Each structure stands twice: as structure tokens, then as C-alpha cells.
A protein has these predicted regions:
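Glycine-rich, flexible loop/turn motifs
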Residues: 49-52, 96, 150, 156, ...
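Amphipathic alpha-helical recognition patches that constitute DNA-binding helices
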Residues: 20, 135, 164, 205, ...
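Generic alpha-helical secondary structure signal
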Residues: 86, 140-143, 175, 205-209, ...
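N-terminal Rossmann-like NAD(P)+-binding domain of SDR-like oxidoreductases, especially those catalyzing
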Residues: 1-196, 246, 337, 347
Length: 347
């Protein structure tokens, strides 16, 4: 595999490309843009997929690199060696429960790591006279806006009101990105996504947890009453939104990415159980029998829901798949990849 710059029109550094959304994005973008080289920098933490690195190594326009985004020397080496002219920044600790157990770990990766990456980009692009043209796209979350009541939608103008160490760390990273744009002239964009689902998601997350518990015939833990509401987005639709923003959005813009598909946790768990009743019948039982209400977690946000009006109106993006069809596709994927449930848990 050639890594010479002359073989490609540009090189983009993707961080966290062996994680859930990053893995899907690298597969999606690399297939659609053969003339662009992707450098996938991933620390391969517990939530990553080492097999993604193996698959990427065989792709003609992807170079996987294992490393930490907090490693300033490594970042400088990557920017120099590959003459990086764009960044798409996924790498982050993202599980809220883990942020409650170990907030400092989230600050290190999500805040300090973003700062190190911004600084490496600034230094290289100043030196190569690309400060205004080379794009830095930061993947954020709708959780930075806090929680909603029964009505209303988050928009790009919603005030920041994070309620967990995770969302606070992502809000901090967002502000750093905007500060580098205003102070140093970096060409930045930010996207705030709703809850993603699809292949390769770590089994600690809600949908894979429900599937895993069903297949093991174990209790399915549902926090509190199960009436908390989340806004669900098919991961490949998210990938197409990131591609659109990175390639076409104005510098300094922010976009909420949402399919505006709200479900209560209990409703979603029951839907998954009903699908599995059909796809993987359990003799003499229904999977919904396994639903088990457990003590609510601290600071559990009641509702997330976002408007995708700006990205639809300004960039023409919209989700391609229906929630029901994509959820069934997700279940089919996990049923065909049951080894995914052997992923290590947080450490």
C-alpha cells in the first residue's frame, strides 16, 4: 500500500476511527472518496474494534495508526509525515455511566485530547499556509444542551446546559474548537448528533445491551420508569451528515444532526423484544418478560430531541432510512456477529 502524498488529492486525519461511529464513517467515506487518504488514529481502548484496524489496513486509501490523541509528539509526527489537510474528530469517551464513575478520564480524553489535536492542526496549517482552508470538524452531541421537558426541540441556538461529566467534557471541547476558530482563524465546523444506533456499537450501550440480555435470557435493565426519551439516528445517516458538513458547510458553522425519531427507553426495549420474538424465537417465552426496572442513575436526563431544520435547509441533508427498517437491520447484524458481545467492558 502506497502512502505517498502524490497518490492522493488530500489527506484527512480521522480520530477514533476504530470506535462505533468512527468505524462506520471510515468504511463509508473511504469507499466514496477513493482519492482522499484517511489516517485513522485510535488508541484502541476497550470500546474500539481491533478488527477494524485489520480491515482498514487492506484498504488502499486508509492508514490505521494506534496512538493517543493526547500525545503531542505523535500528533506532530502524523501531521508532518502525511501532510494532513483536514481533521474529523470522533475520538472520545462517551458512556455517561462511566463518566459518573471516572470523570477525570473523560476530561483527559475529551478536553485535553481535543486541545492537543487543535494545537497540532494549528501549528501544521500555519506552517503550510492552510489555516483558513484546511477544515477541522468536531463531532459533538446533543447532550451538551442538557435535558428537555415533554415539549420543545434542541437547535443550534440552544444554550449549553450539560448535566453529566460526559456532556460537560464535550461542551468544553466544543468551546475549545470555537475558541481556536476565533483566536487563530482555524476553519472549524461542529455537529451535534442525537443517539446513534447500528453495527459495531459497544455492548454497554442501550440497544446492544437489550439484544445481548435477550439472547442470554437475562434481565434487561431499564432505568427508573423507562419513560426517558431519546432521539435515535441510524449511524450511516450520521456518516452522510458528517460527510456533507465536512465538504460543504461554511467555516464556523454548527449543525444539529437528527432523524427526529423519539422513543421512550421502555418502548424501544419492547420493540427490540418483539423483533427478536420473530427473528430468534425463544420457545415458550416472549423476550419482554425479561424487562427489569432498576434504580435510576444520577442526573438521568428526561428527554433529548433535536430539530434537523438547519442542516436540511442549508445543506440538503436528510436521513435515508426508516427507524423500523434500520433497527431490524441492526438486529440482523448482531445476530450474525454474536462475537461482538464478547467485547471487553470499560476499564
Amino acid at each position: 500500500m502506497s502512502t505517498g502524498s502524490s497518490d492522493f488529492e488530500k489527506t484527512i486525519l480521522v480520530t477514533g476511527g476504530a470506535g462505533f461511529i468512527g468505524t462506520n464513517f471510515v468504511d463509508y467515506f473511504a469507499a466514496r472518496h477513493r482519492g482522499i487518504r484517511l489516517i485513522d488514529l485510535d488508541a484502541l481502548t476497550y470500546a474500539a474494534h481491533p478488527e477494524s484496524f485489520e480491515r482498514q489496513a487492506a484498504m488502499p486509501n486508509v492508514v490505521p495508526v494506534q496512538g493517543d490523541i493526547c500525545d503531542a509528539a505523535l500528533l506532530a509526527e502524523i501531521f508532518e509525515k502525511y501532510d494532513v489537510s483536514g481533521v474529523i474528530h470522533f475520538a472520545a469517551e462517551s458512556h455517561v455511566d462511566n463518566s459518573i464513575a471516572d470523570p477525570v478520564k473523560f476530561v483527559r480524553t475529551n478536553v485535553m485530547g481535543t486541545a492537543a489535536l487543535l494545537d497540532a492542526a494549528k501549528r501544521h496549517w500555519e506552517k503550510t499556509s492552510r489555516l483558513a482552508s484546511a477544515r477541522f470538524h468536531h463531532i459533538s452531541t446533543d447532550e451538551v444542551f442538557g435535558t428537555l421537558g415533554a415539549e420543545g426541540l434542541f437547535t443550534e441556538n440552544s444554550p449549553y446546559a450539560p448535566t453529566s461529566p460526559y456532556s460537560a467534557s464535550k461542551a468544553s471541547a466544543d468551546l475549545l474548537v470555537e475558541a481556536y476558530a476565533k483566536t487563530f482563524g482555524l476553519n472549524t465546523t461542529i455537529s451535534h448528533c442525537s443517539n446513534n444506533f447500528g453495527p459495531w456499537q459497544h455492548t454497554e450501550k442501550f440497544i446492544p445491551t437489550v439484544i445481548r440480555k435477550c439472547l442470554a435470557h437475562e434481565p434487561i435493565p431499564i432505568y427508573g420508569t423507562g419513560l426517558n426519551i431519546r432521539d435515535w439516528l441510524w449511524v450511516e445517516d450520521h456518516c452522510s451528515a458528517i460527510e456533507t458538513i465536512f465538504l460543504h458547510a461554511r467555516a464556523g458553522s454548527r449543525y444539529v444532526v437528527s432523524a427526529q425519531c423519539e422513543r421512550t427507553n421502555l418502548e424501544l426495549a419492547r420493540t427490540i423484544c418483539a423483533l427478536l420474538d420473530r427473528l430468534r424465537p425463544w420457545a415458550g417465552h416472549n423476550y419482554a418478560e425479561l424487562i427489569d426496572f432498576v434504580t435510576d442513575r444520577p442526573g438521568h436526563d428526561f428527554r433529548y430531541a433535536s430539530s434537523a431544520a438547519r442542516i436540511r435547509d442549508e445543506l440538503g441533508w436528510q436521513p435515508a432510512g426508516s427507524f423500523e427498517a434500520m433497527l431490524e437491520r441492526t438486529l440482523d447484524w448482531y445476530l450474525g456477529h454474536e462475537a461482538a458481545f464478547n467485547q471487553p467492558q470499560s476499564r
